[in-house]
């Protein structure tokens, strides 16, 4: 079992993004997916919300973790949060995550090489 929760502190944000091998973006939100028994990081997402839509910067598993279903749930939880803010458009950079996962979560390729949802 795992738990997905928003990161609450800058210290935890740096820990999560560093563990995932991604840069920590100023002002971005981060969700961490952790094992419920031992708190081990399983994956994370980093995103932003603006008036013109949300942006998914990263949807990454932790090194050595290969659990497509868990990553799918993390991706959908991230998009659900963005949607609940009233922002119904979301973009993702072409390198935001594995293409198969981004498509499964609901993104489709856009003309600029990234993805739209």
Feature locations, PLM:
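Conserved donor-binding loop and adjoining core beta-sheet/short helix segment
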Residues: 31-69
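Short amphipathic alpha-helix that is part of the acyltransferase structural core
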Residues: 1-26
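Minor-groove-contacting beta-hairpin "wing" of winged helix-turn-helix DNA-binding domains
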Residues: 114-117
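Conserved active-site alpha-helix within GNAT-family acetyltransferase domains
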Residues: 95-112
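Conserved acetyl-CoA-binding loop-helix of GNAT-fold acetyltransferases
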Residues: 66-80
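Non-catalytic positions within long, well-ordered alpha-helices that form the structural scaffold/packing
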Residues: 80-83, 103
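Short glycine-aromatic motifs
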Residues: 2, 28, 106-109
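Conserved GNAT acetyl-CoA-binding A-motif
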Residues: 82-95
């Amino acid at each position: 079992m795992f738990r997905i929760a928003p990161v609450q502190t800058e210290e935890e944000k740096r820990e999560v993004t560093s563990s995932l091998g991604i840069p920590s973006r100023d002002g971005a939100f981060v969700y961490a997916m952790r094992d419920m028994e031992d708190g081990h990081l399983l994956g994370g997402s980093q995103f932003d919300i603006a008036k013109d839509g949300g942006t998914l910067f990263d949807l990454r598993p932790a090194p050595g973790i290969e659990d497509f279903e868990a990553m799918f749930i993390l991706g959908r939880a991230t998009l659900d949060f963005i949607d609940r803010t009233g922002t119904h458009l979301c973009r993702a950079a072409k390198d935001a995550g594995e293409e198969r996962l981004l498509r499964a979560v609901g993104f489709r390729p856009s003309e600029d090489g990234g993805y739209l949802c």
